UniProtKB/Swiss-Prot annotation:
Compartmental location: Cytoplasm
Main location: cytoplasm
Family according to the record: Belongs to the class-III pyridoxal-phosphate-dependent aminotransferase family. HemL subfamily.
Xref: PROSITE patterns: AA_TRANSFER_CLASS_3
Cofactor: pyridoxal 5'-phosphate
PANTHER family in the cross-refs: GLUTAMATE-1-SEMIALDEHYDE 2,1-AMINOMUTASE, GLUTAMATE-1-SEMIALDEHYDE 2,1-AMINOMUTASE 1, CHLOROPLASTIC-RELATED
Name of the featured protein: Glutamate-1-semialdehyde 2,1-aminomutase
Group of enzyme by EC: isomerase
Subunit and interaction comment: Homodimer.
Length: 430
């Protein structure tokens, strides 16, 4: 078969697939270029169809933490596949993975596997509405909980209270019960509880916001949400699709000592294969069919390949010291910030655990409104220059870069050397 370049493949793809990609951000339009097509991946690196080896800080949007094609995980997948790729019936691996996840999260008694993070959040919302008999849900502006209609809401009129559809195709009635508040703004949340508390089924929150770049929670924010939910009989749902098993083995909730009513998971728990899950206290989870009255199902839920990959991944993570990688990332982020500041640009590199975001601003960042004021043109220059020098960052100024346990000192040094080669024009800075 004749080899084709990324450019040739993309020109074909745009005629066959909307935008040439199967998830919008991959098109790289936010950074002013076309996507590269990947041939293979190993450890901390991707290899494009053009033969370029890229140091990977995307890591399949956080789904990879051990490094690409970890031999233990891939060998387990091969063995599982030899016994059948899907059964449509229960298998041993789903029991093993379920127990592993439940043991990692102190407040979780039961878990249900699905095939994506969107399915997990959609199902958790349905469960919350079902057990409370309420319809309204509160989410935070800039936080992403998948593409189910109730979560695709934009801020409407009022003090971050009323919603309008965030995309065509979502009826206004669908987001009418979605309330919005700025992330880290507990005061607005309190006001919303005063107005709508008796109708509020759930509060959804990313414990560390990672879809508006990386914005950690302010001290007291998460505990304040827990207290408000307790006072009003509202379920607190932590979306740990990104942070679960990334910031700690038991997720962000163990870092911040917060026990939610329900938790949504994805990415890492699938070992690089498609997965989602939602779990929590038995008194809620027992309402899910066939045990209870709230329906949710899936043809490939509990797929044996995915369950095997996830279980093997978590087995390896149990014996890994997260603190070492966290310190390495913090050092790298600080050094990267110094390099970029020396080029005369306003910049800060936010980091937490094995995640970081380069924000081109000197302003304090605590919500999506703050993030929107950053210089996205400078980020586009950063992305293109780094990719030219074999470093693959997230192709959007509002996403979060990821680091794996396969990233060692030489990888961080390689990225810093590439950053030193970036040239910014004064017109871009202004």
């Amino acid at each position: 078969m004749q080899e084709e370049s990324s450019k040739e493949l993309y020109s074909k793809a745009v005629k066959l697939i909307p935008g040439g990609v199967n998830s919008p951000v991959r098109a790289c339009r936010n950074v002013g270029c076309e996507p590269v097509f990947i041939e293979s991946a190993k450890g901390a690196y991707l290899t494009t169809v053009d033969g370029q080896e890229l140091l990977d800080f995307v890591l399949s949007w956080g789904a990879i933490i051990l490094g690409h094609t970890n031999s233990t995980v891939t060998n387990a997948i091969k063995k599982a596949a030899s016994n059948g790729t899907t059964f449509g019936a229960p298998c041993k691996a789903e029991v093993l993975l379920a127990k592993e996840i439940i043991d990692a999260f102190p407040g979780m008694d039961m878990i249900r596997m699905v095939s994506s993070g969107t399915e997990a959040t959609m199902s958790a919302l349905r469960l919350a509405r079902g057990v409370t008999g309420r319809n309204k849900v509160l989410k935070f502006i800039g936080c992403y909980h998948g593409h189910a209609d109730p979560f695709l809401a934009s801020a409407g009129s009022g003090v971050a209270t009323l919603s309008i559809p965030g995309t065509p195709g979502v009826p206004e009635v669908t987001v009418r019960d979605t309330l919005l508040a700025p992330y880290n703004d507990l005061s607005t949340v309190k006001d919303l509880f005063v107005m709508y508390g008796k109708d509020l089924a759930a509060v959804f929150v990313e414990p560390i916001a990672a879809n508006m770049g990386l914005i950690p929670p302010k001290e007291g924010f998460l505990k304040g949400l827990r207290a408000l939910c307790d006072a009003h009989g509202t379920l607190l749902i932590m979306d740990e699709v990104i942070t679960g098993f990334r910031v700690a083995y038991g997720g962000a909730q163990t870092r911040f000592d917060i026990t939610p009513d329900l938790t949504t998971l994805g990415k890492i728990i699938g070992g690089g294969l498609p997965i989602g899950a939602y779990g929590g206290k038995a008194k809620y989870m027992e309402h899910i069919a066939p045990l209870g009255e709230i329906y949710q199902a899936g043809t490939l839920s509990g797929n044996p390949l995915v369950m095997t990959a996830g279980f093997e991944t978590l087995q390896l993570l149990k014996d890994i010291n997260y603190t070492i990688l966290e310190k390495q990332v913090a050092t790298f982020a600080n050094e990267l910030e110094v390099i970029l500041k020396d080029k005369g640009v306003p910049v800060q590199v936010s980091n937490f655990a094995s995640m970081f975001t380069v924000f081109f601003t000197n302003n304090e960042l605590k919500s999506f409104d703050d993030v929107k004021t950053t210089n996205t043109q400078l980020y586009s220059i950063l992305f293109r220059s780094m990719q030219k020098n074999n470093i693959f960052l997230v192709p959007s100024p509002f996403e979060t870069n990821m680091v794996s346990f396969a990233h060692k000192e030489k990888e961080f040094e390689k990225a810093l050397i590439a950053a030193k080669k970036i040239m910014f024009n004064i017109t871009d800075v202004n």
